[in-house]
Swiss-Prot record:
Residues 27-48 are annotated as: Disordered. Disulfide bonds join C239-C276. The record marks N76 as: Modulates L-glutamine-induced conductances and Na(+) binding. One of its GO terms (biological process) is intracellular amino acid homeostasis. It is found in: Cell membrane; Basolateral cell membrane. This is Sodium-coupled neutral amino acid transporter 3. PANTHER family: AMINO ACID TRANSPORTER (PTHR22950), SODIUM-COUPLED NEUTRAL AMINO ACID TRANSPORTER 3 (PTHR22950:SF22). Glycans are attached at N73, N247, N251, N324. The lineage of its organism: Eukaryota, Metazoa, Chordata, Craniata, Vertebrata.
């Protein structure tokens, strides 16, 4: 029997259900509900596999990526530059409020993945944009594709911004230079272009996400090393740093001498004690960035369905376990990195945690290794994040065309070119966290999964007033409220000029 070619969207069975691994698909379906023909969209064609040892079944086309590799892929899709901004978020919320918000965002992210998987199971669609088309037609598809594109361009921009800002510091440390030299290899703009062309682009040209699982595991190892270093440095970095206390007291001269005298005479340093006391609940103008930073840090939803498609022996339960495990691992890493980063610098922490360590010792070997690890991690993450953006472009512009390597290469090259231009002219990384986290992230996490589920789930199974659908609508309303509030506060912060964007370079 000839097996139909499949891409991100698999067969719709006649009764509208996603029968996991039970239904032969050789017979054409009779479902008249709205869907799009994606058999010519070559973006995903290379990773859907056939089982050679038995009759073709529904899941035989789904791929060969293992459970562990899928966890690596999804964890790496979650993990990114957002981890560097969480200590700054904690400094502007306090430990207790931060923990509450982080837990809420993690749980809501898991619930939204549940809605996505349930929706895809009903109609047999494995692409985020196609769920939008199935629910609302072309406007839904375009809205989903636009949100995915904006989110992932923002994510890749933040990754490349880290390369732009941190790689010159690494080279400066290796060359043992007190001040950056005015040469091309110390210019972050040249370096980010060089890394994009020599490392990121070749990885981005792969047609299978599964192969990137090995780089995913390596980059996750780099971030674990980053976390260990942050925890270790908490007990090595003195508090307060001389310049932090000087800023707090206005005494920019003789600060170290004054501290030493106070210690010798047994006098309490009230300024130091105040600076080095953690806050448990804080509200200020920068608190508006907290939820966008967290939302930005947990977005992985466009990658869930492609990873589900490539999963070996896929089922909704198995993919939900993968999602829950990935979110749980990232939740622990995020909280520990934020906590120990905050307890190291307190209110002196910058929006990019790693840059704050340059105030301690620019030539510290451990921090140098951490910088290298983070650079490797974000560099290897870019190709995974680029995949759904390219797929969205394929879905919008080249729906019914055969796969073309030329188009495949041109899309990746064009995307990286545009992102490099954004990074070269971007003033800071906090703006990327804030805007993307307050616009596309709430759409992808809260609003779209809920309204897609509400429209796709048949009313004969779940009436419009059923508890699951009411919860889904409430979920969408919460997302819209968070998006509106966060974006409003951020704009007010920009207009008032009170934003203190740490970590600029």
């Amino acid at each position: 029997m000839e097996i139909p070619r499949q891409t991100e969207m698999v067969e719709l069975v006649p009764n509208g259900k996603h029968l996991e691994g039970l239904l032969p698909v050789g017979v054409p379906t009779t479902d008249t509900q709205r869907t799009e023909d994606t058999q010519h969209c070559g973006e995903g064609k290379g990773f859907l596999q056939k089982s050679p040892s038995k009759e073709p079944h529904f899941t035989d086309f789904e791929g060969k990526t293992s459970f562990g590799m899928s966890v690596f892929n999804l964890s790496n899709a979650i993990m990114g530059s957002g981890i560097l901004g969480l200590a700054y978020a904690m400094a502007n919320t306090g430990i207790i409020l931060f923990l509450f918000l982080l837990t809420a965002v993690a749980l809501l992210s898991s619930y939204s993945i549940h809605l996505l998987l349930k929706s895809s199971g009903i109609v047999g669609i494995r692409a985020y944009e196609q769920l939008g088309y199935r629910a609302f037609g072309t406007p839904g598809k375009l809205a989903a594709a636009l949100a995915i594109t904006l989110q992932n361009i923002g994510a890749m921009s933040s990754y490349l911004y880290i390369i732009k800002s941190e790689l010159p510091l690494v080279i400066q440390t290796f060359l043992n230079l007190e001040k950056p030299a005015s040469v091309w290899y110390m210019d972050g703009n040249y370096l980010v272009i060089l890394v994009s062309v020599t490392i990121i682009l070749p990885l981005a040209l792969m047609r299978q996400l599964g192969y990137l699982g090995y780089s995913s595991g390596f980059s996750l190892s780099c971030m674990v090393f980053f976390l260990i270093a942050v925890i270790y440095k908490k007990f090595q970095v003195p508090c307060p740093l001389a310049h932090n206390l000087a800023n707090a007291t206005g005494n920019f001269s003789h600060m170290v001498v004054a501290e030493e005298k106070a210690q010798l005479q047994g006098e309490p340093d009230t300024a130091a004690e105040a600076f080095c006391t953690p806050s448990y609940f804080t509200l200020n103008s920068q608190t508006a960035y907290t939820i966008p930073i967290m939302a930005f840090a947990f977005v992985c939803h466009p990658e869930v369905l492609p990873i589900y498609t490539e999963l070996k022996d896929p089922s909704k339960r198995k993919m939900q376990h993968i999602s829950n495990l990935s979110i749980a691992v990232m939740y622990v890493m995020y909280f520990l990195a934020a906590l120990f980063g905050y307890l190291t610098f307190y209110d002196g922490v910058e929006s990019e945690l790693l840059h704050t360590y340059s105030k301690v010792d620019p030539f510290d070997v451990l921090i140098l290794c951490v910088r290298v690890a983070v650079l490797i991690a974000v560099t290897l993450t870019v190709p995974i994040v680029l995949f759904p953006v390219r797929r969205a472009i394929q879905q919008m512009l080249f729906q019914n065309q055969e796969f073309s390597w030329l188009r495949h290469v041109l899309i990746a090259t064009g995307l990286l070119t545009c992102i490099n231009l954004l990074v070269i002219f971007a003033p800071n990384i906090l703006g990327i966290f804030g805007i993307i986290g307050a616009t596309s992230a709430p759409c992808l996490i809260f609003i779209f999964p809920a309204i897609f589920y509400f429209r796709i789930m048949p009313t004969d199974k779940e009436p419009a007033r059923s508890t699951p659908k009411i919860l889904a609508l409430c979920f969408a309303a919460v997302g819209f409220l968070l998006m509106t509030m966060s974006l409003s506060f951020i704009i007010i912060d920009w207009v008032s000029g009170t934003s203190q964007h740490g970590g600029n370079h």
